[in-house]
Amino acid sequence: MKVLHFGAGNIGRGFIGKLLADAGVEVVFADVNQQVLDALNQRHQYQVRVVGEQAQVETVRGVSAVHSGSDDVVALIASVDLVTAAVGPQILERIAPAIARGLVKRHDGGGTQPLNIIACENMVRGTSQLKQHVLNALEPRYHAWVDQHVGFVDSAVDRIVPPVEAGSDDPLAVTVESFSEWILDKTQFKGVPPALGGMELTDNLMAFMERKLFTLNTGHAITAYLGQLAGHQTIRDAILDPAVRQTVKGAMEESGAVLINRYGFDARKHAAYINKILQRFENPYLHDDVERVGRQPLRKLGAGDRLIKPLRGTLEYGLGDANLVTGIAAAMHYHSDQDPQAKEWAALLAEVGPQAALAKVSGLEEDSEVVAQVVNAYNAMQ
């Protein structure tokens, strides 16, 4: 089996590419970073530092790479068994034209073998969005063939992959946590889904996507925002602060109550899932900076993201939300000279004040009780 994987960054190499290669799949990475491409093609292997209770180094073998903008990518899409991507939500639209050209070549070559395409992004239904970009790049006469032969499979991914620490001169160096989860919507595959280790199939993907968003992503973000306010440098430092931990755990329990009401998750199993995530945040081998984790506050305070969406759920079901309110207030205090969204958020706050700024970004009613609660908590943190 041969896979073309867009994105040879840390997540591509440390998570999806590694999982595929470990399953015996031939992996060809596509990327624009020539230094990384050259290193992959010279070595055809790389090392991944996997950190859990201990740290160990594992070698990923049998890999190669091509430039994302090359004709090689088009030729590969015409012949491979699977296409995956871990490029970041904003980049999906950029890779769509190359995928479209590859599908045309596959069609024109008489290809009838099913091809499945999977975006492995930290977003809801990312592959469905990629599908729209690909269809937009294709002439309409190809659409029926694509519908028949190409599966666009949504997935939920979960693995903490922090940036490489300063001082490493190896372009392929990557560290990942031992925990990983890759859950795919089995109803969207064309043909028989591949049976690969580490790949889980479900017919209720939305439940698992929201479980991850409302628990890992919610908890990670609130740990970062409260951690920055408390003067902590890393996620580990922050979650070991009893005051931060209490609020983060409380927020995940509040969002968990929404999930239990909405999807019928088992309460005891979900409590264990929350505790597992808290342990992951404590990992001494992961030096995950709170400033990095908190980036893009405009997106993270958006209506469908990790802070506001669970809050809306508590309002829908009449559940407690005091810790989520505290976490959102902390997010409003986030600052970073490195993040354009943080600067944009600071300018909006200064221009219209916290109440109107939160309403504008989150979609919550400006005069609602919950916005007033968040603003009161925000002001109390001054």
Curated annotation (Swiss-Prot):
Enzyme Commission number(s) of this protein: 1.1.1.17
Residues involved in NAD(+) binding: 3-14
Known catalytic reactions: D-mannitol 1-phosphate + NAD(+) = beta-D-fructose 6-phosphate + NADH + H(+)
GO process terms (BP): mannitol catabolic process
Molecular functions (GO terms): mannitol-1-phosphate 5-dehydrogenase activity
InterPro entries to which the protein is assigned, alphabetical: 6-PGluconate_DH-like_C_sf, 6PGD_dom2, Mannitol_1_phos_5_DH, Mannitol_DH, Mannitol_DH_C, Mannitol_DH_CS, Mannitol_DH_N, NAD(P)-bd_dom_sf
Enzyme class: oxidoreductase
GO-annotated cellular components: cytosol
Taxonomy, superkingdom: Bacteria
Keywords, sorted A to Z: NAD, Oxidoreductase
Similarity comment text for this entry: Belongs to the mannitol dehydrogenase family.
PANTHER family in alphabetical order: ALTRONATE OXIDOREDUCTASE-RELATED, MANNITOL-1-PHOSPHATE 5-DEHYDROGENASE
Protein name: Mannitol-1-phosphate 5-dehydrogenase
Native source organism of the sequence: Sodalis glossinidius (strain morsitans)
